Amino acid sequence: DNKFKVSGLIFGEVWIKPLEEKFDLDIDVSLKNGKYMDEPFDEMIISLLYKNDMLHIDDISMTKQGSMGMQINGIIPTKKDSKSKKNIIIESNFSNLSLEFIHRFIPDFFKIDGRANGFLKIGGTAKKTTFKYDLNIKDAMFDAIKLGNIKSIGEYNGKYLLVKEVVSSTNNNNIFGKGRVPIDFNISSTNMGSFFKSDSITFLTKGHLEKLSFLSPYISDLDSLKGDINISLNLNGPMSNIDKSGKISIANG
């Protein structure tokens, strides 16, 4: 699994204490000039303790001087017990984090790219994971669409990604979206990053544009369409058979 592969010059200590059917693990290491999931870094720090079926993350951080930084800390219960009520508590802050790097963890999701700043707070359980996020993204790309600068806030409830707001601004084109997407982001899932195809999406997008060049990857003739343009697009229905509707009005075209 590539998620557990990391390269670089390593310094530090790893302490393991075998028990009857368990073990305690204490890791305090630093890696220099390496790669993780094909993302280069100047330094990665891993400081964590595994004991009594709990993973305590003091610090997992990855930095590339002048261009990227990411830090994670918290607690993850690892015991596979349906009666366990111990929750995940994870917080992450990041700056100039590559969304292409994030996409490698969820390859079945739409292609995404750009540089993200913000935070992510994860809770719930491994079986039913929840999180909240607040993101600002530069030079964003979703699928084949260039979206410029994006701000988005939302949360995940174990079944739906609830996008409270996503705002895109590029070249005097402004787009607003909100809705819910049925997708599996549960940590213990073997299908993490896949859509729940039997569940329904509800997503509304509105925009005020000067031209429709952002849609030209799909319909090339739209690239030359200019004016005072208002659009609305709706996605509804099961992921296996999405109903798409919308309207466009153009003035001074």
Which role fits each region the language model picked out?
Residues D1-F119, K127-G253:
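Interface amphipathic segments
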